[in-house]
C-alpha cells in the first residue's frame, strides 16, 4: 500500500532471484497468513454480537438503505463482500435476481443462513477471503464492500479482486471510515487500518483498475 507500491513491484523480480530475498518474501507471506487467521478467529468469536456492534458504531444511520439506492436498475447479480450476518443482503432482496454473500468467517455465514431460514432462493453464501474471491471473472453487476477494508492486511489485493469479478460496466460501492486516530478500534473491533483518506482510496482504486 502507499508510496512503496511501485518500488516493491520493481524489486520483486530481483528478490525472487536471491535466496535471502525469497526468504524475506516467505516470511512476509507467513505474516499475512497469520494475520488472516487472527482476523477470521476474531470475527468467529464476535459474530453473535456483530449486528449490535455495528449499531454501536453507526447509531441511527442505515447503511443498507444507502447501499440499496446505489444498485443499478438492470442489476442481475449483486455481491456483498464481507457480508457478515447477511443484513445488507436482506435489504438487497428484490433488487437483483441473484445475491452473493462472501465472508471469511464460518460463524458469520451460519448466522446469515439462519437469517434467511429456508428462503435461500437466489442467495448464494460463499466462504472465502477477499484477496482470493470465490467468484468468476465478471460475475457480479454490483459489488458492495462495507466497513471491511480496514480489517484487511492487504486492502489493495481485495480491490484487485473486485476489479476481476466485476462485470465490465458494473458498479462498485465501497464504504469505510475516513482516516482517524482512535487506536482503541484496533482492539475493540479488530481494525488493522485507522480508516483511509479519500485521496489514498481513490489512488488505490485507480491502481486496481476501478477508476
Question: Where are the language model's segments positioned?
Answer:
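N-terminal auxiliary segments of SAM/dcSAM-dependent transferases
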Residues: 1-41
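Class I SAM-dependent methyltransferase Rossmann-like catalytic core
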Residues: 47-56
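Conserved alpha-helix/loop element of class I SAM-dependent methyltransferases that forms part
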Residues: 57-77
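Class I SAM-dependent methyltransferase SAM/SAH-binding core
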Residues: 79, 85-132
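A short acidic, Gly/Pro-enriched loop at the edge of an enzyme's catalytic core
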Residues: 131-143
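A short SAM/SAH-binding and catalytic strip from SAM-dependent methyltransferases
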Residues: 141-154
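A short glycine-rich, Lys/Arg-flanked "PGG" loop and its adjoining helix->strand segment in the class I
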Residues: 156-171
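C-terminal alpha-helical "lid/dimerization" subdomain adjacent to the S-adenosyl-L-methionine
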Residues: 171-211
Amino acid at each position: 500500500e502507499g508510496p512503496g507500491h511501485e518500488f516493491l513491484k520493481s524489486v520483486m523480480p530481483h528478490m525472487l532471484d536471491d535466496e535471502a530475498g525469497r526468504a524475506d518474501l516467505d516470511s512476509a507471506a507467513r505474516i499475512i497468513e497469520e494475520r488472516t487467521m487472527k482476523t477470521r478467529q476474531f470475527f468467529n468469536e464476535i459474530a453473535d454480537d456483530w449486528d449490535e456492534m455495528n449499531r454501536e458504531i453507526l447509531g441511527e444511520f442505515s447503511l443498507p438503505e444507502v447501499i440499496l439506492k446505489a444498485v443499478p436498475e438492470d442489476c442481475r447479480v449483486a455481491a456483498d463482500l464481507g457480508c457478515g450476518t447477511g443484513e445488507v443482503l436482506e435489504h438487497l432482496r428484490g433488487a437483483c435476481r441473484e445475491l452473493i454473500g462472501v465472508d471469511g468467517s464460518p460463524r458469520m455465514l451460519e448466522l446469515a443462513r439462519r437469517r434467511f431460514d429456508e428462503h435461500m432462493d437466489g442467495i448464494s453464501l460463499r466462504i472465502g477471503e477477499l484477496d482470493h474471491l470465490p467468484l468468476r471473472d465478471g460475475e457480479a453487476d454490483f459489488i458492495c464492500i462495507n466497513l471491511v477494508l480496514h480489517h484487511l492486511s492487504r486492502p489493495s489485493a481485495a480491490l484487485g479482486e473486485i476489479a476481476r469479478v466485476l462485470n465490465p460496466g458494473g458498479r462498485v460501492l465501497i464504504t469505510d471510515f475516513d482516516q482517524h486516530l482512535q487506536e482503541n478500534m484496533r482492539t475493540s473491533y479488530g481494525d488493522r487500518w485507522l480508516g483511509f483518506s479519500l485521496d489514498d482510496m481513490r489512488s488505490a482504486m485507480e491502481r486496481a483498475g476501478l477508476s
